[in-house]
Amino acid sequence: EGLKTEHELQAYLIRRMEHFLKSRGRKLLGWDEILEGGLPPDATVMSWRGERGGIEAARQGHDVVMTPGETYLDAYQSDPATQPEAIGGFLPLQRVYNYEPIPAALNADQAKHILGVQANLWTEYMPTTYQVEYMAYPRAVALAEVAWTPKDKRQFDDFHRRMQAHYLLLQRHAVNYYRPSTFLAVNAQPDYTRQVNLISFTSEQYQPEIRYTTDGSSPTAASNLYTGPFPVAGQTEIRAAIFKNGQIQGAPTAYTANYHKAI
């Protein structure tokens, strides 16, 4: 065949396989490595090494299934110290939902070649179907909405609200899904005019009741109720936790905010 490189060998094999599949009424679908050496005319590409392969294939007029890192449900979905061992990475629910499968780099005609998305769940770190369910849900629900809903109709806060009903449905069907963590993430945004830090909290919980202190003491059901970002000056020891029916949910989050002249 006069092949000189491994890329030419791969292209030769892919062309042969496409001819074989086409003769039997099938169509070739391959990971984006099949771009190396040239694509057969009717090949569809699965873009898994980021979006670059999908963009290149769509520009050449080939159909594409987008399946980059934002679709790999075998990654950790919360603090690895609290989760079953996984292959690595970090892919929380909101990152899955915020993924947009049609790259901005494509024009309208090229974008028509993006067929959709695929979730990936490699199970070498999952010894049981019980754990497979745990890794798949609720992130698979988020990706389904990404696939089926136009970008201008997707809004995470609204999805988060509607997801509460899906949690009940998953429970009804005895699905071992990941329960949203009670961990609170703390963000400190400097306000240079007032020379303070504006403190805000985010949580995987839906509309949680967050109580906090600014003197280093553990929060109680009578502590300050978080309603939005609040200012703290100098060095401040913040403690915060989620409460439900007067009871603390999980361990308090500790954070030291420090506004000083070097900021």
Locations of the language-model features?
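Short, compositionally stereotyped local motifs that mark structural "simplifiers"
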Residues: 154-263
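Generic beta-strand/beta-sheet core signal
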Residues: 29-33, 46-48, 65-67, 120, ...
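Hydrophobic, well-ordered secondary-structure elements that form the walls
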Residues: 21, 45, 140, 212, ...
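Substrate-binding clefts and catalytic carboxylate motifs of secreted carbohydrate-active enzymes
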Residues: 77-79, 83-196, 204-208
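Active-site neighborhood of glycoside hydrolase catalytic domains
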Residues: 1-62
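Active-site rim recognition segments
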Residues: 57-69, 75
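Flexible loop/turn segments at secondary-structure boundaries
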Residues: 35-40, 52-54, 71-76, 123-128, ...
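Acidic/polar loop patches that form or flank catalytic/metal-binding clefts of enzymes
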Residues: 22-32, 64-68, 150-156, 178-179, ...
